[in-house]
């Protein structure tokens, strides 16, 4: 079957760069691409965080929008920005029915549950350390190595 006969699903990918290594970028993108047509691909990190700097190069290479947050590194600053952007995306782009979130952080569980209540398919992409609560909240969860 050719791809043109398959129904196109509009999907969005959000990556918590503080929580997942940039070495996993290709793997994450590959999984997300299988979920539908990605209209949005973003990775998040703090401007002054050495750990997430490697995401900037990777993002350029893979055409992922690199979101750098300035200011003091407050707890959950990146997480809160991602949650806000996910909600904006859903509100502004009605055709998005699949949301891919790359993280192993339990803090996204409520956001995932809320998206599911709104009828969205939520695909979690995370490492072995991802907690059961997050895995169970997602429509599907892919563990990456």
Segments the model singles out, each with a brief description of its role:
Residues 1-91, 113-117, 121, 129, ...:
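Domain-level signal for Mg2+-assisted phosphodiester chemistry and nucleotide/NA-binding surfaces
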Residues 17, 103, 145:
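Residues that line or immediately flank small-molecule/substrate-binding pockets and catalytic motifs
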Residues 44, 97-104, 111, 115, ...:
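Acidic beta-strand-to-loop metal/phosphate-binding motif
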Residues 51, 106-107:
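Short acidic loop-to-helix transition motifs that present clustered carboxylates
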Residues 92-93, 106:
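GT-A fold catalytic core of metal-dependent nucleotide-sugar glycosyltransferases
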Residues 134, 143-144:
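Class I SAM-dependent methyltransferase SAM-binding "motif I" and its flanking Rossmann-like core
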Residues 139:
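Receiver (REC) domain switch/active-site residues of two-component response regulators
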């Amino acid at each position: 079957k050719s791809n043109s006969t398959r129904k196109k699903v509009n999907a969005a990918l959000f990556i918590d760069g503080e929580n997942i290594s940039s070495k996993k970028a290709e793997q994450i993108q590959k999984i997300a691409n299988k979920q539908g047509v990605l209209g949005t691909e973003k990775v998040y990190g703090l401007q002054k965080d050495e750990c997430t700097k490697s995401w900037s190069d990777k993002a350029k290479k893979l055409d992922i929008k690199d979101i750098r947050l300035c200011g003091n590194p407050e707890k959950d600053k990146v997480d809160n920005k991602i949650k806000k952007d996910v909600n904006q995306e859903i509100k502004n782009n009605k055709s998005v029915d699949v949301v891919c979130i790359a993280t192993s952080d339990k803090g996204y569980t409520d956001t995932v549950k809320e998206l599911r209540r709104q009828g969205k398919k939520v695909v979690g992409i995370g490492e072995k350390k991802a907690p059961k609560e997050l895995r169970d909240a997602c429509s599907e969860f892919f563990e990456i190595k």
